[in-house]
Amino acid sequence: MEIFPAIDLKEGRCVRLYQGEFSKETVMNEDPVAQAIIFETFGAKRLHIVDLDGAVAGESLNLSVIERICKAVRIPVQVGGGIRSLVSVEKLFSVGVDKVILGTAALYDKPFLEETVRLYKEKIIVGIDAKNGFVATRGWLDVSEISYIDLAKQMEKIGVQTIVFTDISKDGTLAGPNVEQLELLQKNVATRVIASGGIASIQDVKKLNDMNIYGVIIGKALYEKTIDLEEVLEVTKLC
């Protein structure tokens, strides 16, 4: 199982949100580059970065910070948030990003998604964020009428190999992941699934590992120290 420490960027800082609410923000580190280096120092093999400003604006607004992070660490970095054009995708790859996560564009711009998957194959990940089982977009501000399962099936047909699934109601809560929704997702698609939202303990991670979940994104639990990064990396290595 892959462990992805999370860095959420807002106005150039590393923050955490509660249930996706921009008004419920906590600054975790004023310097996200320093935070990335900390994660790498403690053994992280990869990083998950979300440009929250970009997710709302529809274009990357923290590109310079992302570039500095990519230059500061030697581990692969995957980035999502506001990536809705081929130019944005190419810019991220040009500054050293390893994989790009598409969210809103996956729902509303299928030709763009198909083209990026054709060009970059496994380097393109789709992020599916769900609220009460329905896909949320544009920085979680809009909720669609399409179920997360239906969108996942569409993504699989297009050739997407990896999906990041987030249950928004769990995000930033330390309430544990939505196991039921993850199980349903696993039953319906054969794509790799990276779980995000609510991870609070080593036990949560072990449970997801037992479900054959490909990867886990851990944010608040690392900052609040309910999960020790070195320990969880060791545990998943032994599983």
Curated annotation (Swiss-Prot):
Pfam families: His_biosynth. The active site is at D8, D129. It catalyses: 1-(5-phospho-beta-D-ribosyl)-5-[(5-phospho-beta-D-ribosylamino)methylideneamino]imidazole-4-carboxamide = 5-[(5-phospho-1-deoxy-D-ribulos-1-ylimino)methylamino]-1-(5-phospho-beta-D-ribosyl)imidazole-4-carboxamide. GO terms for biological process: L-histidine biosynthetic process; L-tryptophan biosynthetic process. Keywords: Amino-acid biosynthesis, Cytoplasm, Histidine biosynthesis, Isomerase. One of its GO terms (molecular function) is 1-(5-phosphoribosyl)-5-[(5-phosphoribosylamino)methylideneamino]imidazole-4-carboxamide isomerase activity. Pathway: Amino-acid biosynthesis; L-histidine biosynthesis; L-histidine from 5-phospho-alpha-D-ribose 1-diphosphate: step 4/9. InterPro entries: Aldolase_TIM, His_biosynth, HisA_bact_arch, Isoase_HisA-like, Isoase_HisA-like_bact, RibuloseP-bd_barrel. It is an enzyme of class 5 (isomerase). Its EC number is 5.3.1.16. It is found in: Cytoplasm. CDD domains: HisA (cd04732). GO terms for cellular component: cytoplasm. Belongs to the HisA/HisF family. PANTHER family: 1-(5-PHOSPHORIBOSYL)-5-[(5-PHOSPHORIBOSYLAMINO)METHYLIDENEAMINO] IMIDAZOLE-4-CARBOXAMIDE ISOMERASE. This is 1-(5-phosphoribosyl)-5-[(5-phosphoribosylamino)methylideneamino] imidazole-4-carboxamide isomerase. It comes from Bacillus cereus (strain Q1). The lineage of its organism: Bacteria, Bacillati, Bacillota, Bacilli, Bacillales.
